[in-house]
Amino acid sequence: MIDASHRTFMARAIQLSLENVRSGRGGPFGCVIAREGSVIAESVNQVTATNDPTAHAEVLAIREACQKLGCFELRDCYLYTSCEPCPMCLGAIYWARLKKVYFGSLASDAAKAGFDDSAIYAEIAQPHAQREIPMIQIMRDEALVAFQEWEAQPGKIPY
Protein backbone atom coordinates (compact mmCIF):
# COMPACT_ATOMS: atom_id res chain seq x y z
CA MET A 1 0.00 0.00 0.00
CA ILE A 2 1.25 3.47 -0.91
CA ASP A 3 1.56 5.89 2.04
CA ALA A 4 -0.66 9.01 1.94
CA SER A 5 2.36 11.34 1.83
CA HIS A 6 3.53 9.66 -1.38
CA ARG A 7 0.11 10.33 -2.89
CA THR A 8 0.31 13.97 -1.77
CA PHE A 9 3.68 14.52 -3.44
CA MET A 10 2.54 12.68 -6.58
CA ALA A 11 -0.62 14.78 -6.71
CA ARG A 12 1.58 17.88 -6.61
CA ALA A 13 3.74 16.57 -9.49
CA ILE A 14 0.60 15.91 -11.52
CA GLN A 15 -0.79 19.36 -10.62
CA LEU A 16 2.47 20.94 -11.82
CA SER A 17 2.21 19.06 -15.13
CA LEU A 18 -1.35 20.29 -15.65
CA GLU A 19 -0.44 23.88 -14.75
CA ASN A 20 2.44 23.76 -17.21
CA VAL A 21 0.20 22.60 -20.05
CA ARG A 22 -2.58 25.04 -19.21
CA SER A 23 -0.15 27.97 -19.05
CA GLY A 24 1.25 27.12 -22.47
CA ARG A 25 4.80 27.25 -21.10
CA GLY A 26 5.78 23.64 -21.71
CA GLY A 27 5.10 19.95 -21.91
CA PRO A 28 2.92 17.86 -19.59
CA PHE A 29 5.59 16.98 -17.05
CA GLY A 30 5.95 17.91 -13.39
CA CYS A 31 8.33 16.73 -10.70
CA VAL A 32 8.70 16.99 -6.92
CA ILE A 33 11.66 15.92 -4.79
CA ALA A 34 10.95 15.33 -1.11
CA ARG A 35 12.93 14.38 1.96
CA GLU A 36 11.66 13.59 5.45
CA GLY A 37 8.13 14.55 4.47
CA SER A 38 9.01 17.98 3.05
CA VAL A 39 9.32 19.27 -0.49
CA ILE A 40 12.94 20.07 -1.32
CA ALA A 41 12.43 21.01 -4.98
CA GLU A 42 9.82 21.02 -7.69
CA SER A 43 9.86 21.82 -11.37
CA VAL A 44 8.09 21.52 -14.67
CA ASN A 45 9.26 20.82 -18.18
CA GLN A 46 10.83 24.00 -19.59
CA VAL A 47 12.27 22.74 -22.88
CA THR A 48 10.39 25.14 -25.17
CA ALA A 49 10.30 28.02 -22.68
CA THR A 50 14.09 28.04 -22.36
CA ASN A 51 15.16 26.54 -25.71
CA ASP A 52 17.01 23.91 -23.68
CA PRO A 53 16.40 20.28 -24.67
CA THR A 54 17.73 19.14 -21.28
CA ALA A 55 15.25 21.24 -19.27
CA HIS A 56 13.08 18.29 -18.30
CA ALA A 57 11.16 18.52 -15.02
CA GLU A 58 13.20 15.78 -13.34
CA VAL A 59 16.59 17.22 -14.32
CA LEU A 60 15.60 20.71 -13.18
CA ALA A 61 14.23 19.43 -9.87
CA ILE A 62 17.41 17.41 -9.27
CA ARG A 63 19.53 20.49 -9.97
CA GLU A 64 17.45 22.59 -7.57
CA ALA A 65 17.51 19.95 -4.82
CA CYS A 66 21.28 19.54 -5.08
CA GLN A 67 21.78 23.31 -4.88
CA LYS A 68 19.49 23.64 -1.86
CA LEU A 69 21.07 20.72 -0.02
CA GLY A 70 24.63 21.59 -1.04
CA CYS A 71 25.45 18.11 -2.33
CA PHE A 72 25.41 16.10 -5.54
CA GLU A 73 23.85 12.95 -4.07
CA LEU A 74 20.21 12.74 -3.03
CA ARG A 75 20.35 9.33 -1.32
CA ASP A 76 17.70 10.18 1.26
CA CYS A 77 15.30 11.85 -1.18
CA TYR A 78 12.29 10.61 -3.11
CA LEU A 79 11.42 11.79 -6.61
CA TYR A 80 7.80 12.04 -7.76
CA THR A 81 7.21 12.59 -11.45
CA SER A 82 4.01 12.83 -13.42
CA CYS A 83 5.38 10.44 -16.05
CA GLU A 84 7.85 7.58 -16.23
CA PRO A 85 11.29 9.18 -16.72
CA CYS A 86 12.88 9.40 -20.18
CA PRO A 87 16.38 7.95 -20.76
CA MET A 88 18.12 11.26 -19.97
CA CYS A 89 16.18 11.78 -16.75
CA LEU A 90 16.69 8.17 -15.75
CA GLY A 91 20.44 8.71 -16.10
CA ALA A 92 20.24 11.85 -13.95
CA ILE A 93 18.22 9.96 -11.34
CA TYR A 94 20.86 7.24 -11.10
CA TRP A 95 23.71 9.78 -10.97
CA ALA A 96 21.89 11.66 -8.17
CA ARG A 97 21.36 8.34 -6.37
CA LEU A 98 17.81 9.05 -5.31
CA LYS A 99 16.29 6.64 -2.81
CA LYS A 100 13.14 5.85 -4.80
CA VAL A 101 11.11 7.14 -7.75
CA TYR A 102 7.33 7.28 -7.98
CA PHE A 103 5.78 7.99 -11.38
CA GLY A 104 2.29 8.54 -12.70
CA SER A 105 1.77 7.81 -16.39
CA LEU A 106 3.80 5.31 -18.40
CA ALA A 107 6.34 6.00 -21.13
CA SER A 108 3.83 4.43 -23.53
CA ASP A 109 1.26 7.07 -22.49
CA ALA A 110 3.81 9.80 -23.24
CA ALA A 111 4.57 8.19 -26.60
CA LYS A 112 0.89 8.37 -27.56
CA ALA A 113 1.00 12.12 -26.84
CA GLY A 114 4.07 12.60 -29.05
CA PHE A 115 6.85 12.10 -26.49
CA ASP A 116 8.24 8.80 -27.76
CA ASP A 117 11.60 7.73 -26.35
CA SER A 118 11.68 4.28 -27.96
CA ALA A 119 14.02 5.51 -30.72
CA ILE A 120 16.56 6.62 -28.09
CA TYR A 121 16.55 3.22 -26.43
CA ALA A 122 16.98 1.60 -29.86
CA GLU A 123 19.86 3.95 -30.68
CA ILE A 124 21.68 3.12 -27.45
CA ALA A 125 21.62 -0.55 -28.46
CA GLN A 126 23.29 0.20 -31.82
CA PRO A 127 27.06 0.19 -32.38
CA HIS A 128 28.43 3.76 -32.21
CA ALA A 129 29.05 4.22 -35.94
CA GLN A 130 25.61 2.84 -36.90
CA ARG A 131 23.55 5.28 -34.87
CA GLU A 132 21.38 7.91 -36.54
CA ILE A 133 23.86 10.45 -35.18
CA PRO A 134 27.11 8.55 -35.81
CA MET A 135 29.58 8.57 -32.96
CA ILE A 136 33.18 8.29 -34.10
CA GLN A 137 35.89 7.61 -31.55
CA ILE A 138 39.15 9.51 -32.13
CA MET A 139 42.22 10.39 -30.06
CA ARG A 140 41.49 7.86 -27.28
CA ASP A 141 45.09 7.77 -26.02
CA GLU A 142 45.14 11.55 -25.64
CA ALA A 143 41.73 11.56 -23.98
CA LEU A 144 42.78 8.88 -21.49
CA VAL A 145 45.37 11.23 -19.98
CA ALA A 146 42.63 13.12 -18.12
CA PHE A 147 41.39 9.85 -16.58
CA GLN A 148 44.91 8.85 -15.61
CA GLU A 149 45.49 12.19 -13.93
CA TRP A 150 42.11 11.97 -12.21
CA GLU A 151 42.93 8.51 -10.84
CA ALA A 152 46.29 9.76 -9.50
CA GLN A 153 44.88 12.97 -7.99
CA PRO A 154 44.99 12.94 -4.18
CA GLY A 155 41.98 14.39 -2.41
CA LYS A 156 39.59 14.00 -5.33
CA ILE A 157 35.91 13.78 -4.57
CA PRO A 158 34.60 10.57 -6.16
CA TYR A 159 31.09 10.60 -7.57
Give a label for each model feature.
Residues R25-F29, E73:
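Short, basic and Ser/Thr-rich N-terminal targeting/leader segments
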Residues I40-V47:
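Short beta->alpha transition motifs characteristic of CBS
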Residues P28-G37:
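Short beta-strand scaffold segments in enzyme catalytic cores
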Residues D3, V47-T48:
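A short, polar/acidic, helix/strand-boundary loop motif
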Residues V47, T81, S105:
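Residues that line or immediately flank small-molecule/substrate-binding pockets and catalytic motifs
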Residues T54-A55, V59-A96:
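Helix-adjacent hinge/juxtasegments
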Residues M1-R22, P85, A92-Y159:
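Zinc-dependent deaminase
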